[in-house]
Amino acid sequence: MEDRLQMDNGLIAQKIVSVHLKDPALKELGKASDKQVQGPPPGPEASPEAQPAQGVMEHAGQGDCKAAGEGPSPRRRGCAPESEPAADGDPGLSSPELCQLHLSICHECLELENSTIDSVRSASAENIPDLPCDHSGVEGAAGELCPERKGKRVNISGKAPNILLYVGSGSEEALGRLQQVRSVLTDCVDTDSYTLYHLLEDSALRDPWSDNCLLLVIASRDPIPKDIQHKFMAYLSQGGKVLGLSSPFTLGGFRVTRRDVLRNTVQNLVFSKADGTEVRLSVLSSGYVYEEGPSLGRLQGHLENEDKDKMIVHVPFGTLGGEAVLCQVHLELPPGASLVQTADDFNVLKSSNVRRHEVLKEILTALGLSCDAPQVPALTPLYLLLAAEETQDPFMQWLGRHTDPEGIIKSSKLSLQFVSSYTSEAEITPSSMPVVTDPEAFSSEHFSLETYRQNLQTTRLGKVILFAEVTSTTMSLLDGLMFEMPQEMGLIAIAVRQTQGKGRGPNAWLSPVGCALSTLLVFIPLRSQLGQRIPFVQHLMSLAVVEAVRSIPGYEDINLRVKWPNDIYYSDLMKIGGVLVNSTLMGETFYILIGCGFNVTNSNPTICINDLIEEHNKQHGAGLKPLRADCLIARAVTVLEKLIDRFQDQGPDGVLPLYYKYWVHGGQQVRLGSTEGPQASIVGLDDSGFLQVHQEDGGVVTVHPDGNSFDMLRNLIVPKRQ
């Protein structure tokens, strides 16, 4: 233990002596550990029991779609699991298990630290991975979890990589604000490098937090008590960094002035970055502005109004490098927050959501934090899962005939080795992956096989699943199987995350957790209605995703739409998903891989389906439950099979009425070829699935998707970049 303590003078402690604690100190520790932790209001109730599918489109796959909760993750030694709620409250905010480290929590130990181990400030996080977690300053916090110490950023200052969040009192409203601040900071900073703690009022006064704080975030709406204000100013004078979020906290001669006309309204903000460039975005105003004060630091933001009201100020403080960035716009609030008053305000704020994160990252970087993207996650093994038990024996027999003696199926891009179990020694690369065939070895907090089964109501599609938590791209997983698999064993690859997601042409597809990611294998006879019109496949898949959501009872008005040729949109405003189709003709059959990705639970950086549901509930007083990716993948595959069958039976006329019901282009005016090209009006799709437009001179022309990109915001059709 001695050689694991780092001293200011670079020496190593030679000996640590044990100390007999006095009875009063022991009693104080006992009281601290017995404190009851207050959690936030309980989360959404579990979704109702799954219902069987009904009809063709109306209730395709009515399983347990309405469940937002995730399953538990493995528990870390010595700490509560980071992603597992410890009570009925919100994850990450309601754990009564506190792992206390005496050197921070006990006054006698602090005394001992000063006298016996002089100058010891901190223990090396890299060398002591199994020490109990330090919860100084978080007693009574709503479920703060023990931080993961391994891999934390090494700071030149020697301070622990802690970001402390102060929201004032322990009221329910304050705890809700704590959750919002935690959420947005987690989206912005390198979460492998920092740990976020709730700094309580008592702890702010009592505990030695300032020596172990890289950034203090003040997000209290109430006036800061004078004694706590004094602590915060002392921290700044020692070189501390402060971020104020819609708080009355101020310094350096600035005064916060109330402007009721601005309160909870959407305003246009001009933000000046450190390099002098400007970012313009829509923001939610707190109703306060900054006045007076000295010249500003590198960053500043003002409203685009006549007074150019100061909303973001950067204030250097003291001689040791202290500084604060103070904001009176709600950078911490998502567009769907309760303070956002109208659907139009929600739309405007969502359109600026990427820029909101850009501004916040610029501020955090200026305050010395890293906002670098986290490292690419390691690839994980594939799991072979079967949606129907009757598929088990035929598929395993087929597999036995097509693997070599080592259980390997090779293709030009990928080798799959089918094994009964996975060991950590097995190599996983984008070109070589193990496939675990024992279903008992499978578990995932992001994918429920039972939920998928309940919502899959197909006769052939999506029956055999290759599942991965992390893979390079689902588009390559089926490469060695697609030309050999029997058609009745519909194959689908599903992933939680992709490291090299693919879009059209050279485009990449971002694939964060919360996105429904899949590649489906479909066989289409050449001499069939759809075989003669293969471009329609991408339209059918986009339509299937929209119908998968809007055919659920109660969800009919969720404003999810299709955008030609291959996109899924929220209204005509923001992209929520997309489709990529690769087809190969062999003999009389098209072998088609349909890649599809759409945002279900990942609100940032743009928008997701559950955002639309939450906003719908707020505007209509409804109580619709959030949806799950596993449910919607199964429902979309179910709807797609029915759309294909209808198309094969009736041709385009069998599906176009539903497509036009949901598409965003009806009667839209566009220009052809370039911004100066002839004007035309969109009239529909032609017999092959290409876009048709009516020109001013009376002619109708067809526009091909692989030659043009559709720019919804400018109403233009322009050549696609090669």
From Swiss-Prot:
It holds the Pfam family BPL_LplA_LipB. GO terms for biological process: biotin metabolic process; protein modification process; response to biotin. It is an enzyme of class 6 (ligase). The modification Phosphoserine is found at residue 295. Transmembrane segments: none annotated. Its EC number is 6.3.4.-, 6.3.4.9, 6.3.4.10, 6.3.4.11. Residues 46-55 have a biased composition (Low complexity). It is found in: Cytoplasm; Mitochondrion. One of its GO terms (cellular component) is cytoplasm. The keyword Nucleotide-binding applies. Keywords: ATP-binding, Cytoplasm, Ligase, Mitochondrion, Multifunctional enzyme, Nucleotide-binding, Phosphoprotein. Residues 27-93 are annotated as: Disordered. Residues 459-648 form the BPL/LPL catalytic domain. One of its GO terms (molecular function) is identical protein binding. The keyword Transmembrane helix does not apply. It catalyses: apo-[methylmalonyl-CoA:pyruvate carboxytransferase] + biotin + ATP = holo-[methylmalonyl-CoA:pyruvate carboxytransferase] + AMP + diphosphate + H(+); apo-[propionyl-CoA:carbon-dioxide ligase (ADP-forming)] + biotin + ATP = holo-[propionyl-CoA:carbon-dioxide ligase (ADP-forming)] + AMP + diphosphate + H(+); apo-[3-methylcrotonoyl-CoA:carbon-dioxide ligase (ADP-forming)] + biotin + ATP = holo-[3-methylcrotonoyl-CoA:carbon-dioxide ligase (ADP-forming)] + AMP + diphosphate + H(+); biotin + L-lysyl-[protein] + ATP = N(6)-biotinyl-L-lysyl-[protein] + AMP + diphosphate + H(+). Biotin--protein ligase catalyzing the biotinylation of the 4 biotin-dependent carboxylases acetyl-CoA-carboxylase, pyruvate carboxylase, propionyl-CoA carboxylase, and methylcrotonyl-CoA carboxylase. Monomer. NCBIfam families: birA_ligase. Belongs to the biotin--protein ligase family. This is Biotin--protein ligase. It comes from Mus musculus.
